[in-house]
């Protein structure tokens, strides 16, 4: 139910998540058709104009898409006339220019600086504290071990991993009351089974778009992880799409893993547990 409470509140991140998903879908559909690819890029740009998080996620996602489907894209580029290439390049530059200007301006970075972990002086103070415990404050070894890069790096890593904690995903949800339903995770607990089955099946069956799905899941919480408040269900909302796809893949494979009476038993148990969790969520 991760996206349900946010979709009722009119948050901008809902629209951003929609256009990210649409952009990925159109990119895959248009990997052999540049006209569809144009709409994919437009969708990605709209998502970046809609909310802050995609401004970090989308460039990384596009780079990954270009790498994964480079052979298809090279074939398309060869077929496009030089005049059209110039027009498309100028169009992309014009549409991207406001984003670039905002990102490089002080006004555009002000919000990020206010929420960023890098504006927190805690890790920096901790570095000085740890260095003070040694005899030589400026020794090379201590500078390598205790410095701002490692301090903020570990802080970022900790915040990043927060978004994959089982208690966040399936048990308690977001620590912020306004971003959660009490006593409920971001997903139903039964969906943890589908997630595990989906992940194992994805690795075993070598699904065609396995790289894209895994990368999407991994980069989805990057922007949220750079803020001091994690895990954050709102800023990491785009995680819901690849995780839901993975769970759906798990449901399909679970169906084919059991047969006969066992299939009926498993379906019955899943339905009962799901209904119980749904009623609990609605309460």
What are these regions (language model features)?
Residues 1-146, 150, 155-255:
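Membrane-integral, polyisoprenol-dependent glycosyltransferases
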Residues 100, 269-283:
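Transmembrane alpha-helical segments
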Residues 246, 266-270:
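Surface-exposed recognition patches
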Residues 254-263:
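Intrinsic disorder
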